Amino acid sequence: MSTKKFKFVSPGVFISEIDNSQLPATFDKLGPVVIGRAERGPAMRPVRVDSFSEFIETFGNPIPGGQGGDIWRDGNYSSPTYAAYAAQAWLKNSGPCTVVRLLGVEDPEADDSGKAGWQTENIAATDAASTNGGAYGLFIVPSASADSAVTGTLAAVWYLDNGGIYLSGTVRASSDALTGSATLIKNTNSPTSPATAEFKVLIDDESGATTDTVVFNFSRTSQRYIRKVFNTNPTLLNTAITTTAGQKKYFLGETFERAVEELSSSSDYFGVVLALSDATNNGGKFRFGSQPAQSGWVFSQDLSNNPATYDPENMQKLFKFISLDTGEWDQSNLKISIQDIAAPTNQDDPFGTFSVVIRRADDHDGSLKVVERFSNCNLNPNSSNYLARKIGDRFVEWDSVEKRHDLFGNYDNASRFVRVEMDQDVDAGATPAALLPFGFYGPIKFDDVDLTSGSTDSSLGAGAFVMGEDDIYRSLGTNGVNFLNSDNNNPPTTELNLKLEFPEFPLRLKSTDGDLSSPKDAYFGIDSTRNGASINRFEESYIDLVRALPEGFSNTAESAGATSHAFMFTLDDLSGSGTQTAQNTFPEADYVVNSRANQTSISSNGLNEWKTVLDSGFGQFTLPLVGGFNGLNIKEKEPFRNSLLTDKTTRTSYAYESLKRGIDMVADPEVVEYSLATVPGLTNQALNEHLIATCEARGDALALVDLQGGYEAAAENNSAFKDRVGDVDTTISDLLARGVNSSYGAAYYPWVQVIDEISNALLWVPPSVVALGVMANAERNSELWFAPAGFTRGGLTDGAAGLRVTNVVQRLTSKERDKLYAANINPIASFPAEGIVVFGQKTLQVTPSALDRINVRRLLIYVKKEISRMAATTLFRQNVKKTWIGFLGRVNPFLRGVKARFGLDDFRVVLDETTTTPDLVDRNIMYAKIFLKPTKAIEFIALDFVITDSGAGFED
């Protein structure tokens, strides 16, 4: 015992505890890495999950595919997420599993064909059906008398590959019946509200022939509701995967139901179809990679006593929220509230406090659905409750040169969904301590369109993102955008003072709105509920309001003459309502834009009156996340289908780049550890070889690949099932042509049918999915070096895969199994009595050796990994015999344990002066030789049945 820790001055007994019973840290169990699509969750980075329930919580349910419907609004559920089923197969038997969810990314040097995202086939508006295309918007305007100011709204957007879309009906100020675009055309019925106004649309194909005539409205309960009567499935535009009978040339994208419902009441309404584009950019082009959603900047209260000069843009920016990962799920499903805003009360601590609450987007203020809560936050950079420290501010960016993620930020992320970006002055402690979050910048939107009253040339102002000239398809307008004409080429005798608005988020205007138990429960800021009687129901058009803008426009910065912030919300614009209390507070409040500058708000009554807003109980507001993008081609059922990858490179295909980057992300063994790797459903030979080469370079993982030539999934083309089955000979010849010779890869054949245990749907999955499950089953019930095949460990009918396997896409004959196994492809056999079984365990190594079997390769991976961990703890010790003995004292017992569990027949470890010579000692090297005799599995059984005569004896 050391006496240095004690201070001896006067006599006494000194006691200390020394705990030598602590257990050494154990290494985590290794599982597979699975790369592919998932419903939601972290994207383009490896994430570990330890159970299937954790997988569902993080990445959502596996998707069986086959679901059509409103894909634009509800998301793509039309193709299976094979990676999710592979993760399920493993996690049902074992754990953990590392998942890389794929989204669309692009090579920094990609050419136009290699850009991520999607676009319509023709992106520009023209007057010819064969070349016309892009985004076309329907604007709806209430009827009004001449020269009356009237406001209309963008109500819907259609996206056309070619052909055209236009209205049919009676034009304004005339009884003439016309069909066309760029002209105000009256509704076809007698509406009782803006939503019930009906319009007739005609849709032409590329030849100019009318293919669809549709009457629709915006009443959600009507059979003519716009989202019920138009195609909302973008994949139907894809001729490569859709049969001729099912093909469409357009789809309905955004609809803004609440904006239509809030139009002023009128006896009639007019619609006009205009192209959404300008001289440079097109509304039908979204060709860019995945990006994260983010909020607008949150800014402070006004600390001055000069309300007349108040401008929210002059307030101090404090922070904003950014999704941890790219994609659209966060913005469609989450919103953020700032609540419990409190002024400082302690003279020793001049900083106020507030809480951040991440809520479900579909909740309402009367019933919060809280996902995460971070309480008692402040803006003091030296505090443990500093906002960035409480939530986290770290993020990663992919370095395409070094092929790695670079990490930025100061504080680990505590939130599963967002990080904080602090204003630099706030982060440096250079702002007043009294500052608190009081408002936020609204999302970026296109500028509204104004037309001048009384002009005979009612053309649009510069920078407007609409077009209605003579050269857009079926235009009835002339002279720019003179769409107020009563008919073509005849100028109108009267004009409207007209504004066309691009929709924006509705804001809470009164604390008494909604079904709240108290006005103090109201969160000002954005409102994600419907208006009217259904006020507590989610407003589905919210999903369209949070979407990213087309290529060429920023979602965070204004573009002069084209886009601007929709609003600047601030609690400084709350006006008191009701009788003021003796404590100078208000029982209710209204949000009135510019009320502080007009000196009618609560906070405009004097210095520090912003505190009255908080004391009155209105210190909370809600802001959205916007602008996230998946970077995928929404016209694909399977955005990474193999038929898109043929003869492609990272520069010519975003799908190829995304898949390759997903593999590159897990190439470094110091970044992520795993023992198996798979990209389920991927049959592209070059990418599969890259996966195998990655595992071989690491030396610690086996790649499970799916082969070209077998079954092709329904999302690959528009062929019938019988034409997509594939065959054994093609699969073998395609593999042999590549000359693959590696013990770090394995392949199986054919695809199998499984039952989704959540939805009870039947689907076909690639063989790598069940192969992964079988390996987990073998590892759980025996050891990883036992052959993952045969009826004991590979019986798929008996549940060995972790999934319920019901069928194979092709029943293999004995000869076909022989041919597959001779080509190092492991057959999945189906027997009448025994059921479906994995009937082989070869690697893709052609050279005969013990390593041409999966159980031996997995044994070697395991042994190398464990002994390398032991060796790592020996580094920087003295290179002497005592150290060698210590190393042997750990390795030999470990190998004896493997031998005792039937992994090795025998072994020998040599570490002495014959291996670590004086020369190696001088070079700081310890060198050991480890000899292994792997235990082989029985794959062939020979039995001779000898028939003897009745007089033979068996004594010998």
Regions found by a protein language model. Name each.
Residues 1-311, 329, 344-353, 359-365, ...:
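Structured, hydrophobic secondary-structure cores that serve as assembly/anchoring elements
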Residues 49, 371-376:
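Conserved aromatic
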Residues 309-333:
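Extended, Lys/Arg-enriched charged tracts that mediate electrostatic binding to polyanionic substrates
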Residues 338-341:
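Prion-like, low-complexity intrinsically disordered regions in eukaryotic regulatory proteins, enriched
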Residues 364-372:
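Surface-exposed loop/edge segments in extracytoplasmic proteins
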Residues 374-386:
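Short, flexible N-terminal segments of the mature chain
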